[in-house]
Amino acid sequence: ACFLLAKFFADIFKASAHADTIGYVIGGGLLAAVAVVTKFSLGSILLFVLFVTHAMVGAVELGTDGWIQNITGNLFTSEQGKYLFIWTSAIMFGLRFCAHFIEHKLKISPIGLLFACAVIACVGLNLASTMTSFGMALVALGIYAVGKTFFWPTMLAVIGDRFPQTGAVAMSIMGGIGMLSAGLLGGPGLGYCKDRFAGEELKRADAALFEEYKAAAPSKLLNIESTAAVGLDGKKLGEAKDA
């Protein structure tokens, strides 16, 4: 959590030449403060694993949600992309009212539900990677939506079930970690991958065309210099599509 906060503050002060240093100093200070408050207790290893897992949930679930309309809009039409986003959101909205039925009538434990959701979401994502028609997209993204429906709330339920003594504190920390991960790793991470792989593919296929449409500044993941990759200029691509 402190690492994510450090990267968050580094992004706030990115205009400064010492943005990373400022971020790490703030993150280190927060870590030291937490260590003093908790009397340097290591805490539960399982709780730490759940926090790390929820960071991945936030990045994958909310990060994908932020990009899904653009991705499907490019595969099909912009209007169809909106319909697919509404379709997946409607499935999740409806199923979350069925959580009580699933747990008490079907007798599925929170851990069992997380496992089932992981399998279903994996199947849905693999199908989504091969979709070529709007009908196939409805099926693939519908399966993915069913899988990801209970990730976030069930992770919070596991915390409350396994660590009741933490009260709302652990749930709040877990939710914060998930949102920070989505904002720092999920959306930006997918954007970085898009820039990196689109640029590399165009450069391999047509170096001259890449030089014409490449972005002025490189993309970086978490502002790390070693991850710098030159993507494509969105404005130039938009003008080319409209031409």
What name fits each language-model region?
Residues 112-127, 135:
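Structural signature of the two symmetry-related core transmembrane helices
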Residues 188-243:
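Low-complexity, proline/glycine-enriched hydrophobic segments characteristic of transmembrane helices
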Residues 62, 145-153, 179, 183:
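Small-residue-rich segments within alpha-helical transmembrane domains of MFS-like 12-TM solute carriers
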